């Protein structure tokens, strides 16, 4: 899983 996607998910949550 890419850190960029994780950052986006964290931003949404």
From Swiss-Prot:
Keyword Secreted: yes
Gene Ontology biological-process entries: defense response to bacterium
Tissues in which the protein is found: Expressed by the skin glands.
Compartments reported by the entry: Secreted
GO CC entries: extracellular region
Residues annotated with Leucine amide modification: 13
Keywords assigned: Amidation, Amphibian defense peptide, Antibiotic, Antimicrobial, Secreted
Family affiliation: Belongs to the frog skin active peptide (FSAP) family. Temporin subfamily.
Protein function: Antimicrobial peptide.
Name of the molecule in the record: Temporin-1LT
Species in which this protein is naturally found: Rana latastei
């Amino acid at each position: 899983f890419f850190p960029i996607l994780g950052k986006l998910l964290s931003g949404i949550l």
